[in-house]
Amino acid sequence: KFQAYADALSAALPEGCGFNTEVVAEVWAGIANAHRDYFRYGDILNSIVETNVSVEKLADFKRVYYEGVNKLTPQLISILGIKEEHIEKFITTIYYQGVGLCGWCQNNPLVHEALKQLQIKRPELDFKAEMRDFISMCIAWYQQK
């Protein structure tokens, strides 16, 4: 799932594209929205997957992840002007926001019923818009570091 997500980011945000922060955030949010299954897997990654697979399988998974990060790094540095030492943290921060929002945005009938019984109205969240705003905020933060 990560490879497809990273490939989509790489294709949509080529070096020298000249996109400003708002455009990068909008494009990235659209890609995140199209790859929500990647973020859903992230919801179980640390607690289930990474604790129940062989070291070899985990190493294969991590290799694909870091190859994707390494491929994106020069592009993101070029486009965003974020220092190399901050790129992995930048990507990871966006990832965990996506994981959290996907967990929040999922339609779970049991949760809906429990909240209905408690007469709690949960606010509607727009995953893409929330991701866009968060990515824009992260870009601004990491650019000034």
Give, region by region, the residue ranges found by the protein language model.
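Short acidic/histidine-centered micro-motifs embedded in hydrophobic/aromatic stretches
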Residues: I44-S47, F90-T93, Q97
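Membrane-interface starts of transmembrane alpha-helices
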Residues: L80-I91
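A short small-residue
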Residues: V49-V53, H86, K116-Q119
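C-terminal peripheral helix-coil segments that are non-catalytic and often amphipathic
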Residues: E67-P74, S78, I82, Q97-K145
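Hydrophobic alpha-helical connector segments
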Residues: A4-Y38, F90-I94
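Short secondary-structure transition hinges
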Residues: A29-K71
